[in-house]
């Protein structure tokens, strides 16, 4: 199976060789647009975005140095038009877990995309890691912004006065820093 650290290794290899990292983002909603903004700012990245909303795509193209493709995120034809066969990474960030997972499956099966990341919000999927793998649903890394925010809030409640809590070595040590504004 693939390791979760694979995307980092791939990115590091590309940056060392001074090549462009070709990234395909699926979904131009809040999460997808934010990811596109941050990734497109780096010169080493070439970003393409797929979405079904032409207005959102036009707006992104006006604001960012990205290529846009109109269509359904999991459609083989749309992925082909976006150049999925030449992508180093697919990041599926639509609002649908199922579309994100199917898009990763299509990218893997038809285009042999090396790294596939999917936004998966439902704990029903996330709580079953055995669903994911090269011979299963080929998602190298599942991300859930909602769960990250929830975890962060839970830690802040557990450690009042800290604005950030960091875990080290599987929660054996916790570091929190308290910041008070000066009047």
Question: Could you describe each region identified by the protein language model?
Answer:
Residues 4-6:
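Intrinsic disorder/low-complexity segments enriched in small, polar and charged residues
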Residues 10-181:
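Cytosolic regulatory regions of ion transport systems
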């Amino acid at each position: 199976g693939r390791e979760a650290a694979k995307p980092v290794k791939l990115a590091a290899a590309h940056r060392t060789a001074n090549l462009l990292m070709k990234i395909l983002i699926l979904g131009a909603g809040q999460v997808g647009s934010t990811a596109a903004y941050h990734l497109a700012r780096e010169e080493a990245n070439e970003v393409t975005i797929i979405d079904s909303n032409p207005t959102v795509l036009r707006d992104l193209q006006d604001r960012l140095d990205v290529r846009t493709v109109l269509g359904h995120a999991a459609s083989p034809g749309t992925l082909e038009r976006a150049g999925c066969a030449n992508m180093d990474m697919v990041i599926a960030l639509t609002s649908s877990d199922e579309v994100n997972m199917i898009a990763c499956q299509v990218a893997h099966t038809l285009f042999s995309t090396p790294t596939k990341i999917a936004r998966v919000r439902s704990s029903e999927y996330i709580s079953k890691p055995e669903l994911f793998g090269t011979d299963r649903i080929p998602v190298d890394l599942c991300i859930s912004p909602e769960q990250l925010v929830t975890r962060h809030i839970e830690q802040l409640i557990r450690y009042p006065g800290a604005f950030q809590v960091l875990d080290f070595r599987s929660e054996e040590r916790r570091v929190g820093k308290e910041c008070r504004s000066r009047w």
